[in-house]
Amino acid sequence: GANEKASENLTVVPLTVTIAGKDFLDNEDLNMEEFLTSMEENTEEGRTSCPSIDEWLKALEGSKRAVMLTITSGLSGSFSSAYQAKQIYEKDNPGSKVIVVDSRTAGPEISVIQREIKRLVEDKSVRFVDIEQKISEYKTHTHLLVILQSLHNLALNGRVNIAVAKMAKVLNIDVVGTASEEGKLE
């Protein structure tokens, strides 16, 4: 996610958010202040683009084992493109094993899941083939709430009634949300 530092063992494959014709990559180089200002000042619907299969494949290059964690499939095609990349990569690289995890969430909870994946990968007592099941179990016990300070972008994208968004702004109401079992914002 945004501002998540890439390292020797972690590669960020970013989503692209397009606002008023300007692309913002959701990676460590994202200028959050500029991004949020653009969202707030924008009067048109923004767009998001998930990473392509080729972008996932590039991130996998040279890996014998990899775990790919995506934003919820309830909001993005990232899981689908990552899973297709996994299938291609494993076919083209016999002996490789790729695990694709649908976070079923967005925001800070993804970082919590990512840290648990890292812990499991580094734990010599955990077999790589068991990581997928362990993460699935872990996700059932991990839930974070999201506070939306503005409904502006959701209203532009038709996910919230524009009158409700304006009323929330006038009354200075922050909305609390969470992800459903399917990974959709509630």
Protein language model annotation of sequence segments:
Residues S52-Y89:
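N-terminal glycine-rich phosphate/adenylate-binding segment common to multiple enzyme folds
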Residues G1-P51:
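N-terminal glycine-rich anion-binding loop in soluble enzyme alpha/beta folds
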Residues P94-S96:
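A short helix->loop->beta-strand "cap" motif at the edges of active sites that frequently abuts
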Residues M68-T70, V98-D102:
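Short acidic, glycine/Ser/Thr-rich loop/turn "cap" segments at secondary-structure junctions
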Residues G1-V17, L75-S78, Y83-Q87, I99, ...:
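Mixed-charge interfacial surface used for oligomerization/domain docking
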